[in-house]
Regions:
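Polybasic/polar functional segments that serve as interface/processing modules
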Residues: 1-123
Length: 123
């Protein structure tokens, strides 16, 4: 079976997010897994790390690629990354879910199409 190299990649910077949300590893793990499920992705594994004195990284390994968040609670900042291979999963659904949960004051987003030759931005 031959697989397509086509993929969608969304990267997001969130600013003005509540400190307590960004420093709660269990809250973030729960919601990243739920976001992945809502997007149609298949979760294979979750890796997570708490940093001292603040900050969290959660990586959700997907059959279709990955969803991750890196937080800097003391700066009210989170970096989110969602890459999905193929056409069966919609990373925008996962990103929208997370943004709605974290309620940032502002965000910056880039949408990329990958695996078609050149990397193409779609925003």
């Amino acid at each position: 079976m031959e697989y397509s190299t086509f993929g969608k990649h969304i990267i997001v910077d969130l600013w003005g997010v509540d400190f307590s949300l960004l420093d709660d590893i269990h809250f973030l793990e729960y919601h990243l897994v739920n976001a992945a499920d809502c997007s149609g992705a298949h979760v294979l594994n979750v890796s997570k790390k708490e940093f001292q004195p603040y900050g969290v990284t959660v990586l959700v390994l997907l059959s279709e690629s990955h969803l991750s968040i890196h937080t800097y609670p003391e700066q009210n900042f989170a970096a989110i990354d969602c890459y999905t291979c193929g056409t069966t999963v919609e990373p925008k659904i996962a990103i929208d879910y997370i943004v709605n949960i974290l309620k940032p004051e502002r965000m910056h987003i880039k949408r990329l199409i990958r695996g078609i030759g050149e990397i193409v931005t779609t925003d």
